[in-house]
Regions:
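Active-site-adjacent betaalpha module
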Residues: 3, 7-133
Length: 133
């Protein structure tokens, strides 16, 4: 996801990840490849007003690994939204951050209770990518 927030939410959260600014850029370690699909999200929920659901449906994707900077905000809301849309979200517990550790712990406990599973990065297994045409 590419995070790009609007100015009208800064009264609550302060200025952060402004669309087009340096802090909204995707880091080099996660460089976008030609075959990648980038979803630009403007809210806590990566499904809200984006093409994410349609893209996942079109590619037959049901299982989602969810990670990110704020476990108790974007990660939890995106995972919850995925669950409501009949996807199977799994939060990667050591690939999420938070400002307060107690908020991170709450988010992980809540995700585990809601979705039945959180997972450590070392336990993530990926299926081989399909062969290119």
């Amino acid at each position: 996801f590419e995070d790009a927030h609007y100015y009208d939410e800064f009264d609550r959260w302060g200025e952060h990840v402004v669309e087009g600014s340096w802090d909204a850029e995707i880091v080099d370690d996660l460089a976008v490849r030609e075959e990648d699909h980038v979803v630009v999200k403007h809210t806590y929920d990566a499904f809200y007003r984006t093409d994410l659901e349609g893209h996942l449906d079109a590619h037959g994707i049901d299982d989602l690994l969810v990670c990110g900077t704020l476990a108790n905000v974007c990660v939890l809301h995106t995972a919850g939204s995925a669950g409501l849309r009949d996807f199977r979200p799994v939060v990667v517990e050591d690939a999420v951050g938070c400002i307060e550790e107690s908020h991170r712990e709450y988010a992980l406990e809540h995700a585990d209770w809601l979705f039945g599973e959180t997972i450590a990065r070392e336990d993530v297994a990926f299926a081989p990518a399909p062969a290119a045409d």
